[in-house]
Amino acid sequence: MTENRGTWCFWPATATIAGPSGGLPSGVALRQCAGNLPRKFEPQAHRTMKQAVIVGVQGVIGRYICDHLLKLGDWEVIGLSRRQPAETRPRLRHVSVDLLDRADAEAKLSGLTGITHIFYCAFQSRPTWAEHNAPNLAMLVNAVEPIANASMVLEHFNLIEGTKYYGSHLGPFKTPAKESDPPHMLPNFYYDQEQWLRTNQPASRWTWSALRPHAICGFALGNPMNLMTCLAVYAAISKELGLPLRFPCKPGTFDAIYQMTDSALLAKGMTWAATTPAAYNQVFNLTNGDFFRWRNVWPRIARAFDMEPGPVQTIKLTEFMTDKAPLWSAMQQKYGLEAHPYEQLVAWPFADYVWAGDWDIMSDMTKIRRAGFHEYVDSEDIILGMLAAFHHQRIIP
């Protein structure tokens, strides 16, 4: 660690963390660097290769499922997104496609004749909840139908939903939420997407599954709707200004029970659901498997930045942090950080939205455990490991 980058108290300076182009950070895995040696690949002749399409491959979910499948070695991967990736990735074929344009989808996807699995991680944001429905359903249909028509070997479609299905974004809801709980008062585009699958799958040769994570913890440059990068940049700027690390949202949020889903854990769950008969045509909650309160983890986060933990001071991050781009640029120069544009790292309205909920967020994991998925991670370790990775990747001082 270079002297002018400040003090980092969580991760040893000798640790080696792969950057985004060479493998993505994943909480607990970051604490097991010695175990992250490349797997010995078996001869291709001894395996049956599966071919996956990842819709939304450049997002915080898509990047991790892509990495996971490629590391397994018996998957070929085709990634879909609207924009060309800023980096090339070995063994990943990319297709740029506008899934809101059916003609473009047909033209780009009708040649994908060997696809066995589709992992759907795409999302189109709109100003109101009602406006989310049409574009997000259209993108799903425009991805599934051309590929299903082209590939006679399509086996499974995996969909990512979330706890907003239960109304976690609206206010207090029944906790712990179970998959059998009804959705909140519509509209909800998760409901529309799932109902389309339930309606159309019985006449198809493929199966489907849907997972409901919460507060996905990962990193994807150019996808600023990520609480971990917002937290990291907020803490780094607070330290640069000589401030304690105050919790910037409601007192109730500080004390409410919360949960997260590590992106690497989610990738494992997606692969399990796509290849396990017990998961076919089923919906599962998938979180880290534990719960926490921000009040309890906040001192550990402050220590990681060598800062004093401050009290709650409720502010709108959108109002107080948007003007910090010049300061961040100066910090990048001062500490030799990667020159990622401020607006590509953080979306303060998203952080305000996530931290606005001063009610418990809890999902029941019984169903997925009974079906055979038993992976779990420690959420506090995930948070601290992700922040350490940002430091070693020179994203923050």
Model-derived regions: residue spans:
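Active-site Tyr-X1-5-Lys
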Residues: P183-L211
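Glycine/proline-rich active-site loop of Rossmann-fold NAD(P)-dependent oxidoreductases
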Residues: S204, I216-Y234, A264, W272-F284, ...
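Mid/C-terminal beta-alpha module of Rossmann-like enzyme folds, strongest
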Residues: L266-A351, D364-T366, R370, L387-R394
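A conserved pocket-lining segment of Rossmann-fold NAD(P)-dependent short-chain dehydrogenase/reductase
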Residues: V233-T261
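Conserved Rossmann-fold NAD(P)-dependent oxidoreductase catalytic core, especially the SDR/UDP-sugar
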Residues: I118-Y120, E131-F189, S209
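NAD(P)H-binding glycine-rich loop region in Rossmannoid oxidoreductase-like domains
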Residues: P85-T88, R93-N142
